[in-house]
Amino acid sequence: MTKATIVLATRNAGKVAELADALRAYGLDVLGLDAFPQVGEIEETGTTFEENALLKARAVAEATGHVAVADDSGLEVDALERRPGVYSARYSDDTPDLPGDTRDARNNAKLLLELDGVPAERRTARFRCVMAACTPDGRHVFAEGAWEGHIALAPEGDNGFGYDPLFIDPQSGLHSAQLSRDEKNARSHRGKALRRLLELWPAFWRG
């Protein structure tokens, strides 16, 4: 497989670091959107993870002339009918007066509020990720991964981002935000989706 520059369709530093670690191991040069200031904000107008991932990958591939990889991921909580789902990143935007200085903190606060009184055995949840790789001429491929776990009563840990402080990994018993980057890559929805994407990569690259 020819070495190539791959553009990760995100400015989220946490995602760039997490995904770039794995992609570099396959001999790929990895850049985030900060290297392409001409690419504007891409609005996620899809109603599924697949739609949003492809929308972002296609827009970035067309704008940069490189193969682009985008993901859309979110948290599905069974007791909340799989909310927040595709709205995970902006879950708290319609709820005023939540505690927290950041959107992540407010999202976590809203999740805990909605799960107030829900017993541990009913707090099952999963992180789900769909990745799309797209060429500048529009060829694309999807890969998916999921990470099953449950939602804690309170946040713990300083690593990660998003809902990591509340998500408990059943294998280790630790919150996702307590895991090292390597541990998280080995278990996480994003890591699983990426490994599946890399399995598909040679055929995708050859076209």
Curated annotation (Swiss-Prot):
Q: Detail which positions bind substrate.
A: T10, R11, N12, A13, G14, K15, S73, F161, G162, Y163, D164, K184, H189, R190
Gene Ontology cellular component annotations, sorted alphabetically: cytosol
What highest taxon heads this organism's lineage? Answer: Bacteria
Q: Does the keyword Metal-binding apply?
A: yes
Gene Ontology MF terms = dITP diphosphatase activity; ITP diphosphatase activity; metal ion binding; nucleotide binding; ribonucleoside triphosphate phosphatase activity; XTP diphosphatase activity
Which Gene3D superfamilies has this protein been placed in? 3.90.950.10
Q: For this protein, what does the record note about how its cofactor is bound?
A: Binds 1 Mg(2+) ion per subunit.
Q: Which InterPro entries match?
A: dITP/XTP_pyrophosphatase, ITPase-like_fam, RdgB/HAM1
Q: Does the keyword 4Fe-4S apply?
A: no
In Pfam terms, one family for this protein is Ham1p_like
Q: What class of enzyme is it?
A: hydrolase
Coiled-coil annotation: which residues? none
Where is Mg(2+) annotated to bind?
E43, D72
Q: Which cofactor does it need?
A: Mg(2+)
Q: Which reaction does it catalyse?
A: XTP + H2O = XMP + diphosphate + H(+); dITP + H2O = dIMP + diphosphate + H(+); ITP + H2O = IMP + diphosphate + H(+)
**Its GO biological process terms?**
nucleotide metabolic process; purine nucleoside triphosphate catabolic process
Q: Which UniProt keywords apply?
A: Hydrolase, Magnesium, Metal-binding, Nucleotide metabolism, Nucleotide-binding
Q: What is its EC number?
A: 3.6.1.66
Q: What residues make up the catalytic site?
A: D72 (proton acceptor)
Cross-referenced HAMAP family: Non_canon_purine_NTPase
Record function comment:
Pyrophosphatase that catalyzes the hydrolysis of nucleoside triphosphates to their monophosphate derivatives, with a high preference for the non-canonical purine nucleotides XTP (xanthosine triphosphate), dITP (deoxyinosine triphosphate) and ITP. Seems to function as a house-cleaning enzyme that removes non-canonical purine nucleotides from the nucleotide pool, thus preventing their incorporation into DNA/RNA and avoiding chromosomal lesions.
Family affiliation: Belongs to the HAM1 NTPase family.
Sorted alphabetically, which PANTHER family does this protein's record hold? Answer: INOSINE TRIPHOSPHATE PYROPHOSPHATASE (PTHR11067:SF9), INOSINE TRIPHOSPHATE PYROPHOSPHATASE/HAM1 PROTEIN (PTHR11067)
Q: How does it assemble?
A: Homodimer.
Name by which UniProt lists this protein: dITP/XTP pyrophosphatase
